[in-house]
């Protein structure tokens, strides 16, 4: 059996998400009544090696951490390389991969979308898991072109998981403002509050 050695790189849109620039701070209001700041404290790109049946791959990944010192909490954003740059694919006329996923997680709630070449979220799997809202207002500020992304616990690539006993959660995401609202499957949430002060 021949072993295949693909190399997967990040797309430009995965590398250049301006809303996750290191040092950027955003103010939020939690559903339990307190306010806090999330700051991009880490932004690292690295090569990850993995293997599967007849495949030994190198994958360029990017991890961004948004952290709060009080309360202590963090949101993790991962971009996984899916643009194949392998010489083997060119020589053997294999299908060229063009996957550009973004995964955002907080505690045990995760959200996964495919990005297009402009960084716009798209559905991965079944319909209804990503909705585009023309406008939505949070804490008195109206945002345009917001994406409502369903949490991963309630669907797989083909079906909704109707027997899940937790709440359906949504991530409200803007390409220009980042995370506007993050809901968890245990019923809590936090929402952007522009002009807020955590001092």
Regions found by a protein language model. Give the residues of each.
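Conserved functional acidic sites
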Residues: 1-199
């Amino acid at each position: 059996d021949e072993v295949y050695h693909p190399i997967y790189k990040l797309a430009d849109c995965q590398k250049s998400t301006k809303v996750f620039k290191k040092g950027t701070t955003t103010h939020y209001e939690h559903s339990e009544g307190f306010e806090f700041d999330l700051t991009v404290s880490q932004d690292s790109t690295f090569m990850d090696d993995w293997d599967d049946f007849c495949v030994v791959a190198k994958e360029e990944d990017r991890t961004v951490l948004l952290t709060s010192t009080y309360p202590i909490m963090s949101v993790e954003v991962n971009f996984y390389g899916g643009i194949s740059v392998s010489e083997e694919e060119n020589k053997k006329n294999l299908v060229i991969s063009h996957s550009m996923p973004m995964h955002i997680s907080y505690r045990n709630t995760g959200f996964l979308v495919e990005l297009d070449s402009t960084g716009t979220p798209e559905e991965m799997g079944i319909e209804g898991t990503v909705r585009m809202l023309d406008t939505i207002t949070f804490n008195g500020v109206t945002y345009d072109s917001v994406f409502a992304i369903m949490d991963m616990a309630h669907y797989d690539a083909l079906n909704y998981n109707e027997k899940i006993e937790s709440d359906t959660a949504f991530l409200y995401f803007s390409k220009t403002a980042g995370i506007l609202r993050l809901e968890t499957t245990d019923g809590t949430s936090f929402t952007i509050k522009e002009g807020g002060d955590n001092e």
